[in-house]
Amino acid sequence: MFGTVRDLHKAPALPGVEFIEMDVRDEVSVQVAVESIIEKTMRIDVLVNNAGMMMIGAVEETTAAEAAALFDTNVLGILRMTRAVLPYMRAHRRGRIVNVSSVLGVLPAPYMGIYAATKHAVEGLSESLDHEVRQFGIRATLVQPAYTRTNLDANAPRAETRIEGYDHERDVVTRSVADSVRNAPGPRAVASTIVEAAFGPWRMRCAPAGQASLLTKLRRFLPAGPVDASLRKKLGLA
């Protein structure tokens, strides 16, 4: 098993995992990393696209450059990795691509609009990809976590522009997100769901048990009005 990090000096020691330095934002870095794995193993059976960035801020407060940076990692990073790996999967006529999305990919929240937009893009890309590659014995699937006690949410950057009219609601949502992350389960449940998505029977979408599974079901089966009201109440905006 191989993992990738932008800085090998910061890679954790994990038994059975060999880390390779790579940056999903850099086409050359991605190609070099994938080719180094192929040289050692001759194949790649499973690709998990888990790199991601989050940002808190109103849509109006977010510059095009900030949005582009988020899309570069969250969406184009998946595209770069997928394009690098697919030729080898097609050659072996088998493989599984697991793209880590988010509940926000189906249930967008205020002040996380650009992040939600990237995850909606991941959802659409993954469904289209799955249709295209199944003829080669390859399937693409999505994992949709909710809040998880990791640094992604806790250390999410804020949009640099601040518009006074959004201050109150933005601060309320920021505190709500921080509280939810503090009380959220650790990453183990998400990791288990990723393993199931990678090696279990194929499903287009997999959500960890608990809040993530509940929220995706609410979005799917309840009318938009009650879901909207419930979301605003949860974030402290009602």
Regions found by a protein language model. Name each.
Residues 58-59, 66-68:
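Substrate-binding pocket helix/loop in short-chain dehydrogenase/reductase
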Residues 36-49, 55:
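A glycine-rich helix->loop->beta "capping" turn
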Residues 132-181:
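C-terminal beta-strand-loop-alpha-helix "lid" module of Rossmann-like NAD(P)-dependent dehydrogenases
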Residues 25-40:
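Conserved Rossmann-fold cofactor-binding substructure of NAD(P)-dependent oxidoreductases
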Residues 82, 118:
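Active-site helix of classical SDR
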Residues 15-28:
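Rossmann-fold cofactor-recognition segment
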Residues 102:
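Residue(s) in the substrate-gating loop at a strand-loop-helix junction
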